[in-house]
UniProtKB/Swiss-Prot annotation:
Belongs to the bacterial ribosomal protein bL28 family. InterPro entries: Bacterial_rp_bL28, Ribosomal_bL28, Ribosomal_bL28/bL31-like_sf, Ribosomal_bL28_bact-type, Ribosomal_bL28_sf. GO terms for molecular function: structural constituent of ribosome. Pfam families: Ribosomal_L28. HAMAP family: Ribosomal_bL28 (MF_00373). This is Large ribosomal subunit protein bL28. The keyword Cell membrane does not apply. One of its GO terms (biological process) is translation. Coiled coil: none annotated. It comes from Wolinella succinogenes (strain ATCC 29543 / DSM 1740 / CCUG 13145 / JCM 31913 / LMG 7466 / NCTC 11488 / FDC 602W) (Vibrio succinogenes). The keyword Iron does not apply. One of its GO terms (cellular component) is ribonucleoprotein complex.
Amino acid sequence: MARKCFFTGKGPMVGNNVSHANNKTKKRSLPNLRTVRVKLEDGTTVKLRVAASTLRTMKKRS
């Protein structure tokens, strides 16, 4: 299962850890994904992986 938000497509980002000596090593920052149950119009429920920021936006706009 991919580490992506179902609605926004938000995925992992790549950056650098920079030490005091200016040595750089790669790091990945993963999105804050939550598994959410969504009820569809026909009454069935589906589990989706959604970013926490997307959940906040959904609550704000609903």
